[in-house]
């Protein structure tokens, strides 16, 4: 799109948001485009990010989106891990809320706040007001896997993450928040 707009004197950048809707005002941005084009929108980005430290100029047009896909693959991996551990906790008669409380207080916090957010949504059963749907995650997983193949670097763990989320969607949870993934994992064990 940037190439089509350039002859008309229109600048274009890719500036995907890195964060959930609850983080508005503190989002990070992976920015792709020219220095000149980014300078024109910097004030808007500062309002959305809250600080210059959250604005990352990744490279030319398209590179911001590439980094976003990698970021979402990491989110998907954390989601798949949370799905399995939360399903196993329930299967063994353990409290999902207690698992999250202990994991966040212990070393699982190194996984980021995503684990805490996903785990909390699971423990509270909040899936109907999605911050990011299972099907959206599948779309980004596919784009990331395709991108990796184009670079001659197939992702083994990424393919497993994609498999988990496709299984979740096939079970009818595609439009739900991705935190619902644990239910699909648990259904497979109870079958």
Where does each model-flagged region fall?
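Eukaryotic N-terminal targeting leaders
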Residues: 8, 190-191
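Helical "substrate-binding/catalytic lid" subdomain
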Residues: 63-189
